[in-house]
Amino acid sequence: MPDSGLLYKEWRQNKVALVITILVFILGNPLSILNMYLIYQGCVTGKENWVGPCVFSVDYLNSSFISLFWIWGVVLAVSQLGIERSKSFFDFTLSLPYTRGQIFHAKFLTGGMVIVVPQLIGYVLSVLLIMLLKPDQAVYFHNYSLGMIIVSMLAYSLVMAGGALTGNSFAQLLVSFTVAISPFLLISLPVINLEILFGGSIDFIHGPVPKWVQYFIPIIYVDSKWAENSPYYLVIPAIMTIIFYIIGYISFVKMSNERNGYFFLWKPLNRPVQIIVIIIGIMGFGYFGFTASESFAGYLIGMGTGAVIGFLISYFAIYKKMKLL
């Protein structure tokens, strides 16, 4: 259990973000139900302006406030690591009489409690509200409400891991987003380029893929369609949350957090990542050039353009130190 002094410091330092997040998590779920109820009441009082029967349905796949809860996990992680480092508060934090492991645990516990507890409170309030309003049906309510807690923690732990590897907020967000779409970048994009080069279709990418495989792609949880499937699939983001937590913890403890402003805290990562960015730029723009011109010449021009853009982006993002706030 982290020291109470560290927990208090986290609260004081990130109080605005924490309070806003708590309020959003507590009120978001009940407000979603109230919004659906008001829409139903609007139908009842103005039937002549509506098509079809008036049905009070709590349908969480048809847009709700809680569909964006994962964003607040991102906001908390950036506030706790990226912004703190950019404002040069991190040197003070590391000078406190605590180990780096204790500091990371305090940050993660604070963020985790703010994500989990208020959402559980909002869930209980929503259950009571449903019992009071008695909707005709509640579609995916329990699966989506409880699953969003896991999804929010996944977003939080992913961005915390990104922040433990990087030296500024921009780098933290960029690395986190790249990891979120990494299966596409590492598998689908190379296969698409191989199809262009060899002029044929590769069965691996177009053949049947088990449904559970897609849930290893973090970005997939931005779309609420995951709630339609078995709740057992939520074991996958729960496991990924633990993995990202471990990566973040090890990176925070082992790397030179004092190197404020740089893209990566560990310099040996710079060159390999730059090469990967250039390769992705070549493949991405090559595919775009081929689809735009439907010719191999367009593919080559796209590859050349991607190489230049990939080099420039990687050079200025990775090797140029950002000014501190």
Swiss-Prot record:
Localisation per UniProt entry: Cell membrane
UniProt-listed InterPro entries: ABC-5_transporter, ABC_transptr_acetoin_YtrC/YtrD
Cellular component GO terms held in the UniProt record: plasma membrane
Principal subcellular localization: membrane
UniProt entry keywords in alphabetical sequence: Cell membrane, Membrane, Transmembrane, Transmembrane helix, Transport
Parts of the chain that traverse the membrane: 16-36, 63-83, 113-133, 146-166, 179-199, 233-253, 272-292, 298-318
Similarity-based family: Belongs to the ABC-5 integral membrane protein family.
Assembly notes: The complex is composed of 2 ATP-binding proteins (YtrB and YtrE), 2 transmembrane proteins (YtrC and YtrD) and a solute-binding protein (YtrF).
Protein name: Probable ABC transporter permease YtrD
Species this protein is from: Bacillus subtilis (strain 168)
